[in-house]
Amino acid sequence: MTFELRAAFSPCGDQPEAIAKLTQGVRNRTPSQVLLGTTGSGKTFTIANVVANVNRPTLVLAHNKTLAAQLYQEFKEFFPNNAVEYFISYYDYYQPEAYIARNDTYIEKSLLINSEIDKLRLSATRSILERRDTLIVSSVSCIYGIGSPENYTSMALELTVGTEYPRALLASQLVKMHYQASSVPQRSTFRERGSVIDIFPAYESELAIRLEFFNDTLTSIDYSDPLTMMPKESVTSVILYPGSHYVTPEAVREQAIRSIREELEERLAFFQDRPIEQDRLFHRTTHDIEMIKETGFCKGIENYSRHFTNTPPGAPPTCLLDYFPEDFLLVIDESHQTLPQIRAMYRGDFSRKQSLVEYGFRLPSAYDNRPLTYEEARKYFHNVIYVSATPGETELNESQGHIVEQILRPTGIPDPIPEIRPATGQVDDLLEEIRKRLSKSQEKILVISITKKLAEDIAAFLSELDIAAAYLHSGIETAERTRILSDLRLGNIDVLIGVNLLREGLDLPEVSLVAILDADKEGFLRSTSSLIQFCGRAARNVDGKVIFYADHKTLSIEQTLKETERRRHIQLEYNKANNITPKPIIKAIFANPIPQGGKKAVQDTPQKPLSTQELEKLIKKYENLMLQAANAFRFDEAAQYRDKMKAAKEQLLYLS
């Protein structure tokens, strides 16, 4: 299949030129290109056009899952008939294993896996192995810690009508593929009923596979509704992929066990004069070996990944990139933040594991379950497009002049020129500006503070004045962060104060004011790149305004003003030449998509916007009601609960 782009609009402004240049660069095998596009210029739409033109499997990397979710939603709309997949961390909660030597504290790995995201991850790898019209959106931190594609594909099971499959052996094979026998129809399970085997793939929630046999001969294969098991499509063959990325063939598992034991013997000899560490390592590793031998899995199995891939110490680990073919297209979004994250991940992982290995909690091979170094990652950059409004030196140097600018916005809105006001009395002045805008409906204000404490104090001050304000910084727990962002999108918050709001992907057309406090305090979040990015947050509103509160102009402020004026001049000249009047973006705030009405309302659904916690409870409630209805053979009712659960999950995915 080929990528089929669907959009209600056509490329305009400088988008056609950018699309043509980037497409030609990919076709000419240019290793690196930069799309330097202003905020709101339609960079995602441009990339979608390039993907459709070159028709290659594509990986889009974002630096956090908030941005990844936004990109996933957009590409899903552009390519409704293609395999657009989402690959992020499947942990709702994750505490990595660690040992603090100074106070002899061992912290065991603790985690909570999100089943829905696990399904999406498995769906992503299935698609890239089967289809070339696959686009995967991923956060950069989660492409690691995944089993090898060779082991994964070797455990896939191809079933063909007319072939004999001894039923007992087939059931045994399904268990080895991490499917469980169960009478309840849910993901990663199978059930036997007479001459029928129903399989519920780990990567599907809308389809089940029904196999019908005569003795041991497979007579039919149907894709069926997982609740009613009514057939949707009959096929002559199907490939069933494993229920986990960590499955391994038995021969590989046996070889890995031998290799682990050899390393254990070497390490026990190393700890000869340290009996505590020696005993600890022996018992922990021996227990893991027994678990792998009996079940094919153990807690922390990723720490033995080198033994399963049979690679030498220090070799690059397998990752999501290995699942892609050689000619894939790599798009690195917000590259000025994503590339530094790739560089930093290896160092952070190594320092955490150092004490675990040194004190006998892990074998040295645990070091090889790690992120790629930047040099290792670059070997995958055969065809890469860096996307950023402010690309860094790395991207500019690696692109060797292949830089495509996209300055014009489809809306015709020019870059706002920052207004500089004194930092003295900045909070009082800010309050006056906020009150002006709150008299207009649906306008929002972003405030950038220099410290977490100042963000909290300003939020408290505004709240006392009955202004709907909230603060957001790195000290906020993930669940609370999600709630705040959803409240902002749903209109429950008018003013958001933060230290680094760039990472949140807040591109809201309702934002009419961006105020940067203490803009003259030169540093990371007051650099030219950051200031330009902050200004872009107001460039989606016709009346967008940016205020720098500064007592003097720093070099970063001067460079920001110069670049903003350059872009604004180009934008205004184009508007004048083409008789364009700036117009606002039509972009509705995300609403509750849970369906109402229909054939028969099985349960009243709350009309008010739901928080993350409320959605999670609602999903669990619908799941229980769905299973109860299915077990009672009330399949129409169960299907309605399934649809409601799916809609709630989609909203939760968007908000997270």
From Swiss-Prot:
Listed under GO biological process in this entry are: nucleotide-excision repair; SOS response
**MF terms (GO), sorted A to Z:** ATP binding; ATP hydrolysis activity; DNA binding; excinuclease ABC activity
The cellular location(s) given in this protein's UniProt record come to:
Cytoplasm
Major site of localization recorded for this protein: cytoplasm
**What residues does the Helicase ATP-binding domain cover?**
24-409
Please list the coiled coil stretches: none
**The protein's name in its UniProt record:** UvrABC system protein B
Which positions fall inside the UVR domain? 616-651
Q: How does it assemble?
A: Forms a heterotetramer with UvrA during the search for lesions. Interacts with UvrC in an incision complex.
